[in-house]
Amino acid sequence: MYFCNVFQTKYRNMLRIAVQSKGRLFDDTMNLLAEADIKVSASKRTLLVQASNFPLEVLYLRDDDIPQSVASGVADIGIVGENEFVERGEKAQIIDRLGFSKCRLSLAIPKKIEYPGLQWFNGKKIATSYPNILRNFMKKHNINADIHVITGSVEISPGIGLADGIFDIVSSGSTLVSNNLAEVEVVMKSEALLIGNWKMDEEKHQILNEMLFRFEAVRSAQDKKYVMMN
């Protein structure tokens, strides 16, 4: 999609966006920027890269560092998974729901177990990388579980005797199947969010509004294409 680029000379400041440095969310984010005719060289994977035709700086970070970077003002805006945004609890504003990188946070247990309901987790040990979301969910439902916080390879925990069940991201469910686990409760659905620090100056707000206009144009074009195909 082509947009008329008059912004390099119009603005003195640059908007800084924090994005995930690798993985599915990185790929989806770069695709969105490309569709919005914002040219960022993916080959220059340094920490900070400037778009060649739009007043935007791209700051590459780990996904769990993005909410804090936006809340603290290191970045003006960021694209992050809703799961990470909710887990971190940082004070940033949700500007837009982007509709990609969709997944869910779910409870799963060994598939050989006949699951009677949420009360099964009372007194059980649950491995997760999202303790805050899980703790709030368990408190809401009056479940007293032992939350064991680990990073990475959460799905192997029941198989090695580390936990009775897990609370983790699920996309296709294939990872659960390969580890003999069954998804029993969907706690939260997640997608990519555009978050922002509203302490930006007026000029940066104008740049942000232009970016949002382009993102909406991309979505509208995708919707029309989908309708035509069906």
Q: Where do the model's predicted regions map?
A:
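Pocket-flanking alpha-helical
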Residues: 64-69, 74-90
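Active-site-flanking structural segment that lines cofactor/substrate pockets
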Residues: 50-68
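Small-molecule-sensing regulatory modules
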Residues: 11-56, 80-93, 97-104, 111-230
